[in-house]
Each structure stands twice: as structure tokens, then as C-alpha cells.
Amino acid sequence: MSAPAPDPFAKIRNATNAHRERHGCSAFPYANGPLLAALAGAANARRILELGTALGYTALSFAFGVRDATIDTIERDPDHVALARENIAAAGLDHRITVHEGEFSSVLPTLDPGYDVAFFDGGTPVPALHKALRGLLRTGGTLITANLNQGGTADSVRKALFDGKAWRSALVDEHGETAISVKL
């Protein structure tokens, strides 16, 4: 059995974790950037939307997964926005990744629909944001939802993702934290 491919952005993931510990903030990078890169590649994504930039780890992972995709990523913390922009520019990908500063609910209505992949990793999933993401995804587009094990509103989102009416969904980890859903 061969070893998994190295994570080209592990340094940024580790820096994000260190930043969170130092500052006590909510910068949590998704633990498996290579999985996100592979999913975006499998979906042949051209447009990707991310909610929850932190320091740019997952946006960079998506860009690595599909070499000609453009990524819109949203972050409300101005310090995280600045650090993400620095990391993205240092990787030479600032021409493909746009970091939008603001609340999800304020930025999402300004974006054009037709995304191939959307990724929610910005805290506890809430139904209103998932409804907005559904409106921005094309039919057949892929929604990746993290943090489904946080209870509260996440339970409502999980129920909607698995009702079989609007999405075809599967969990991607044994803890039930992340779902991959295709918009029907």
C-alpha cells in the first residue's frame, strides 16, 4: 500500500491551528485539504464557493485540485482576511482566489449563481445559509457541508440534506461530521 500524497498546504493548515491557539479565535482549518482537492477535481469544478476562509488553507486546496477553477471564499474576520490574502498571494494563486470580507448573509446575495462546488465550513450549519448555497449551486452541483455533528441548527440542515427530495447525500467520515451532497 502506498502512502497518501503529501498535503502541499500542510504548513498553512498548521499555521492556522497555531494562530487559533495563540489568539483564541475561531480559525479552524478543515482537516483534509487533499480530500477537498480530489472532490473538486472529480466534479471538474470551474467555480467554487467556500464559506469560512480562515487563513486560506481550503481555498488553496481547492485551487490545487482543479488548476483552472476560480474560487470565491468568504470570511468575516478582517485579520483572517488579511492573512488569507497573504497566504494566497504567496502561493501565486491570487488571480484565481477572491477573498470576500463580510458576513455570509451579506456577501452571498452579491454573488452570481452557477457554482459547481460549494463548501460550508464556517461554524455551525444553519438552514438559511444552506438555502442560499442551494440557490447559488447549479443543478448537479456538489455541496460539501462540515460541522454537521454540532447539534442545534446543524440537525435541521442534516435532515434537509438527507430527505432525498432536494439532495443526494452521503457522509464522508465515520463521525458524521461532513456530508457530500449533489443538488437534484
Please state what every model-predicted region is.
Residues 1-117, 124-144, 148-184:
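A short alpha-helical cap/connector motif
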